Amino acid sequence: MKYDHLLVRYGELTLKGSNRKKFVNQLRNNVNKSLKGLDGFVVKGKRDRMYIELEDHADINEITYRLSKIFGIKSISPVLKVEKTIEAMSAAAIKFAQQFEENSTFKIDVKRADKNFPMDTYELQRELGGTVLKQIENVSVNVKRPDHEIRVEVRLDAIYMYEEVVPGSGGLPVGTGGKTLLMLSGGIDSPVAGMEVMRRGVTIEAIHFHSPPFTSDQAKEKVIELTRILAERVGPIKLHIVPFTELQKRVNKVVHPRYTMTSTRRMMMRVADKLVHQIGALAIVNGENLGQVASQTLHSMYAINNVTSTPVLRPLLTYDKEEIIIKSKEIGTFETSIQPFEDCCTIFTPKNPVTEPNFEKVVQYESVFDFEEMINRAVENIETLEITSDYKTIKEQQTNQLINDFL
């Protein structure tokens, strides 16, 4: 079947009332950005849905795949656009039915947005169904559990006919909900947290704390790859890599061993808070899950949050671990997240970390050293990378260059 359009249905944009135009425009921009590098199509965003006009050479499968990853899209259908005549609809219905397997069943489903169309819904269903039965052998009607469903939408401008409905990612278009800073550790949770806030229309930049030589280049490349996977859905993402070694060593030198985990995370939050103001973000996002580990109890969160007035969003706060793993697999980050490279959260881990840290005590331990200068230095020496969906690490670039030189 050669389709001439893709019908793109909006997600929650239908709920946005007077702001709908802003949301539709942002979604259209996101679609154009996602389809960059492809040709043979024209994007037409309308108030209630989007149409993508296809030329003969358009790669419909690749376009559909990319659209399915964009937040704000509920579903996509390859469609035939036909004239508003029963003859044109009948001819299209026969085209669809010619693709059916022998002895298969079908139904005709009509939605009549144009109430002025001369035939009502049931008349159209009977007429088109009857035409298929007359013209196509060895098929029958089953309205409850059909093998195939020919869908017909009667709209003001034309008739749109289709069979397939490809699920989209739902949510809201990224860029409509402000900017946040995602604390990206390299584990299973934080990429899922990032994806969850992006689903709500939020733009993200990511921050990662790197402590060489205790953390390896492979750990850094792992985080780059996680960012790249996130970028597949939203376009380029800035990744800020913080040199954290000296700060982490100092914490472990001056703070009581049971409190080093709490204090380390307070230092991370202080660095993140400064970066938030530099990049114009409105919140910090992390993958914390209530009670999962010692640093994620309510007492720990209270002690850690105290160093910032910036809102800290925790999309996974009440999820079961299994739910997070399922989502990680769905978005494609799980296999990368479980690669066995240590991040700064797993080094210097005390044997018996405090689970209910006393806020006054952690402040007292940290007061023996002025950390502000070290924090400022860490922020000043941040390495910022812009990660695209086709980003390659230095190691990959070097490997490709060696291959090219050899050839």
UniProtKB/Swiss-Prot annotation:
NCBIfam families membership: tRNA uracil 4-sulfurtransferase ThiI
Similarity annotation: Belongs to the ThiI family.
Cross-referenced PANTHER family: TRNA SULFURTRANSFERASE (PTHR43209:SF1)
Record: residues binding ATP: 183-184, 208-209, 265, 287, 296
Gene: thiI
Chief site of localization: cytoplasm
GO molecular function ontology, one term from the record: tRNA-uracil-4 sulfurtransferase activity
GO biological process: thiamine biosynthetic process; thiamine diphosphate biosynthetic process; thiazole biosynthetic process; tRNA 4-thiouridine biosynthesis
Biological role stated in the UniProt entry: Catalyzes the ATP-dependent transfer of a sulfur to tRNA to produce 4-thiouridine in position 8 of tRNAs, which functions as a near-UV photosensor. Also catalyzes the transfer of sulfur to the sulfur carrier protein ThiS, forming ThiS-thiocarboxylate. This is a step in the synthesis of thiazole, in the thiamine biosynthesis pathway. The sulfur is donated as persulfide by IscS.
Locations listed in the record: Cytoplasm
Stated name of the protein: Probable tRNA sulfurtransferase
